[in-house]
Swiss-Prot record:
InterPro entries: ATPase_NBD, Gcp-like_dom, KAE1/TsaD, Peptidase_M22_CS, TsaD. Binds 1 Fe(2+) ion per subunit. Fe cation binds at H114, H118, D305. This is tRNA N6-adenosine threonylcarbamoyltransferase. GO terms for biological process: tRNA threonylcarbamoyladenosine modification.
Length: 338
């Protein structure tokens, strides 16, 4: 069987990315143009600005991915592209480019769910990994606990009922005037703080639920900060960061490992931007070790948005006959099992 070459495109939020893969798991190139510096002054991603930046960057990024992989357009077997969830304008830039290219080259177009892309990042790093297993997907827009039954076959066990975990990090960072994105900033501060200094609440919800909730925790931290400011008392940002982070990662880890044990698996994977959080990696690894469970996660470059993960997911869709025609449209609220 000859090698299958995938060109993948990702533009769901504020990264313009393109990647070339061989047989789904071998990354030949992975180019990412980030807009963090552009959006930092706004304290978050501005959708219109993000879309314009994608338009400026996408052709350059795709060409660089092809050049680095040392392949031409005629070597590509199919194109994988994110079509949701995400910012609709941003999604349309990547999707329109991919559709035009697939049409011109007369090769298959494969639409990829961004969340499915995140969990697929682990296939790239861990060559021996295959379904079934449990995965925890945690990012600025998503917090999902998913049973991966097979390639492309999933059951959502739990998800956030309000804020995503990464969204909570950004909001607390903004409340302390620390900057954007909040996740890495709080993670770094937490390393020098006392995680037991402030007892913030943990929301475990119903006993049999795998769902998450971070709005109560967020409100508790905001109330703590406001109370300190009203009394003109010192706020030790390192302790706030460490205590807040501990409250988040404790719930994420506990629920994830409960799902692994309840379902009878011995492997859990992490993915998404928050999977790069050192506190989460340490906590879930510690709890997993005590229960004989193996934890796998991608390198940092594959945790945040990238096209390699989209290409991996797209490859498995492609070999399973899941392709799309030119009517494929952006779906900003796409669910993982749609």
């Amino acid at each position: 069987m000859s090698d299958i070459i995938t060109l993948a495109i990702e533009s769901s939020c504020d990264e313009t990315a393109a990647s070339v893969l061989k047989n789904g798991r071998e990354v030949l190139s992975n180019i990412i143009s980030t807009q963090i510096e552009t959006h930092k002054k706004f304290g978050g991603v501005v959708p219109e600005v993000a879309s314009r930046k994608h338009v400026e960057n996408i052709d350059i990024v795709v060409q660089e991915a092809l050049d680095k992989a040392n392949i031409g357009f005629n070597d590509i077997d199919h194109i994988a592209v994110t079509y949701g969830p995400g910012l609709v304008g941003a999604l349309l830039v990547g999707l329109s480019y991919a559709k035009a290219l697939a049409y011109t080259l007369n090769i298959p177009l494969v639409g990829v769910n961004h969340i499915e892309g995140h969990l697929s990042a682990n296939y790239i790093e861990h060559k021996d990994l295959k379904p079934p297993f449990i995965t925890l997907i945690v990012s600025g827009g998503h917090t999902h606990l998913v049973e991966v039954k097979d390639y492309g076959k999933y059951e959502i066990l739990g998800k956030t009922r309000d804020d995503a975990s990464g969204e909570a990090f950004d909001k607390i960072s903004r409340a302390m005037n620390l900057g954007y994105p909040g996740g890495p900033i709080i993670d770094n501060l937490a390393k020098n703080g006392n995680k037991h200094a402030i007892e913030f609440p943990r929301a475990y919800l119903e006993e049999d639920s795998y769902d998450f909730s971070f709005s109560g925790l967020k409100s508790s931290v905001l109330n703590y900060l406001n109370g300190k400011r009203m009394k003109n008392e010192e706020i030790v940002v390192e302790d706030v960061a460490a205590s807040f982070q501990e409250a988040v990662v404790e719930v994420l880890s506990t629920k994830a490992l409960k799902a692994v044990k309840d379902k009878g698996y011995n492997i859990i994977t992490l993915s998404g931007g928050v999977a790069s959080n050192s506190g989460l990696r340490a906590k879930i690894t510690e709890l997993a070790k005590d229960n004989g469970i193996t934890v796998k996660y991608p390198p940092l470059i594959l945790c945040t948005d990238n096209a390699a993960m989209i290409g991996c997911a797209g490859y498995y869709n492609f070999i399973n006959g899941k392709t799309h025609d030119m009517s494929l449209n952006a779906v900003p609220n796409l669910k993982i099992n749609q």
